[in-house]
């Protein structure tokens, strides 16, 4: 049984919002999540067609069914049958029908434009496209696992995707052929040599007068030499000798090549020597590049001395403590000093005693 939209209760629910725990049709999804900036940031996805209570994460292309992660593990037999499986990326914002068609053209049938009415709420669809969708549309992919083979996620790197316009490499006219060799399908994640990124061997050299596109060059306006070396910007792309390697991996999960994106800092030391000045120029805290680690201090050496000093201070304080006697009940003490005793104990009136505080003879 097809689930109904929780908002209008008439149309088929296609979207599941985990923040609102609601099943929505496309019309109500645009209406609800365009109300305020907070709802605009809600993460949604297609609804799971098995349990109808979770966002779908995987789409079986052979069965044409969307599954959430739990249903895919326990209910579906796609893995055993060898079906083709496509991962679904969540989204946020208010995508237009054109954006929906681009994202799920192979999934939603009929097209999204046929599922959306020409009027959403009280605004025509064309007005929404010109105002809200063009200014507030944002695609936010989540939980993207980077693997060594990017063939499953070619749509994420597609030039048609408008989610990240700043990452699209713009080439000048006549320079498209030079970047055809840029293939990320078989590229490993950890690059020890900069030439491995663009598939060049160490024996290949680029002629100085050869035109290189802007996406593969360092900033042309910067002609200053690198710190601690005689290399200039014009020779930055020359291949290094086989024995010399430059490690550009700084601990990120997905290393990006500075040569590829044109972000090599002019003070980068190609010789491989790192100093505090280089990191200060690039905005990195010098605390990360100290000659000694923060835990490699002289604390172990000075520990016995500090312990002895602490013991001396404790003994001095102990000697200065005052244990003066304080009479708690002065009236009782005054009476006790005048009572008669026998073997140190008080005696009753009329009984024999061996000590009388008022008699000087008994005291002696």
From Swiss-Prot:
- Give me any GO biological process, just one: regulation of secondary shoot formation
**CDD domains, A to Z:** Bbox1_BBX-like (cd19821)
> Which GO CC terms are listed, alphabetically?
nucleus
Q: SMART domains annotated for this entry?
A: BBOX (SM00336)
Q: Which UniProt keywords apply?
A: Metal-binding, Nucleus, Repeat, Zinc, Zinc-finger
Q: Which PROSITE patterns match?
A: CCT (PS51017), ZF_BBOX (PS50119)
Q: CCT domain spans which residues?
A: 280-322
One annotated GO molecular function is: transcription cis-regulatory region binding
Carries keyword Transferase?
Answer: no
**Name the record gives this protein:** Zinc finger protein CONSTANS-LIKE 12
Q: Which organism is it from?
A: Arabidopsis thaliana
